[in-house]
């Protein structure tokens, strides 16, 4: 009789809900940027809303089981914020502005493979190429890279001509050469953002184990992200008028993206990282593209291109070959339990008593 793994399906449901929420955030951000809102100003407001939303949860839900907050933990969270909030948003939003919502999220399908490659480098995963499992992992990773090259180098024809209003507007204002150059630059920015985001999964997975209070850690991470994003905003443009948000849709979108995107979604991902590891958590990221494509096609009237479809299909095939190998890798659970090399003063690995208490905290 097959045993029903409650914790596994709880994590699956959690990541599915997170990806729906993040896909809506992506579509909203695309619309706000197209309307002229500064990309880093939007990120700063989003993180500020998320920080204010999470403070009460961090204070009241984790006041009895919060470990000592040392200087090294704060430094680790500052670095995590740099990877997971400010820098990744900076590069991703440039790519989003220069391409489309659907295309930009097609690149997110690379996250599991890049995360797996980084996990190998940092010894969070193992790879034995002499076994079928090891070869499946390697093959899946290589197929994902090939799919990413298709996305970058081949745009193809539009598959949704009846919904071409959005791209026609850009075509009228930009020459074909300029559009091609912007699309290529956007693709490069998206690749950089994916590498940064994948690195965040590795870093945050370690932090979540030595400091398992996801509300507190996410609140601090968001606060650092506010400071970093504000500085990036001031470096790129110093006009005070860019901080004024008058449009009602933009206000509502910033509130939603802060509460859901930077608040609940990051808390949920921190919980899943601690429970299931970086590769499992990142493997659900391709779902964002599916939901975002539906929302973008319906509300933003974006084109869907042949290259995006082919590249995405190749990446997804590679992804699930990788996941098959991951699921068959019996040593994965042993690897996750190995001592962490993240040297955080006063913590080390999280005590058993702390972990058992932290499991009671809801990630909702």
From Swiss-Prot:
It comes from the Eukaryota. It holds the Pfam family EamA. The chain crosses the membrane at residues 9-29, 41-61, 76-96, 102-122, 138-158, 183-203, 215-235, 251-271, 277-297, 304-324. SUPFAM superfamilies: Multidrug resistance efflux transporter EmrE (SSF103481). The keyword Glycoprotein does not apply. The keyword Transmembrane applies. It is a multi-pass membrane protein. Its main location: membrane. Residues 26-152, 195-323 form the EamA domain. Keywords: Membrane, Repeat, Transmembrane, Transmembrane helix. It is found in: Membrane. GO terms for cellular component: membrane. GO terms for molecular function: transmembrane transporter activity. PANTHER family: WAT1-RELATED PROTEIN (PTHR31218). Belongs to the drug/metabolite transporter (DMT) superfamily. Plant drug/metabolite exporter (P-DME) (TC 2.A.7.4) family. This is WAT1-related protein At3g30340. It comes from Arabidopsis thaliana (Mouse-ear cress).
